[in-house]
Curated annotation (Swiss-Prot):
Keywords: Ribonucleoprotein, Ribosomal protein. This is Large ribosomal subunit protein bL28. It comes from Koribacter versatilis (strain Ellin345). One of its GO terms (biological process) is translation. GO terms for molecular function: structural constituent of ribosome. It comes from the Bacteria.
Length: 62
């Protein structure tokens, strides 16, 4: 399942782990997603929403 917010479309960001010896390996920072039941067009729908959208009040919980 994709790590993408259903409200804003925010996805994972990519970068590098850098050790003390400066060994570089790839890594990714995933979005903090939460399963939520929300009202969309008057109907209840299960969505995976990032915590930024939850805190900003972009959706109405069912």
């Amino acid at each position: 399942m994709a790590q993408v917010c259903d409200m804003c479309g925010k996805g994972p960001q990519f970068g590098n782990n850098i050790s003390h010896a400066h060994n570089v390996t790839k890594r990714r920072w995933n979005v903090n997603l939460r399963p939520v039941r929300a009202k969309v067009n008057g109907a209840t729908k299960r969505m995976r929403v990032c915590t930024t959208c939850l805190r900003s009040g972009k959706l109405v919980k069912a």
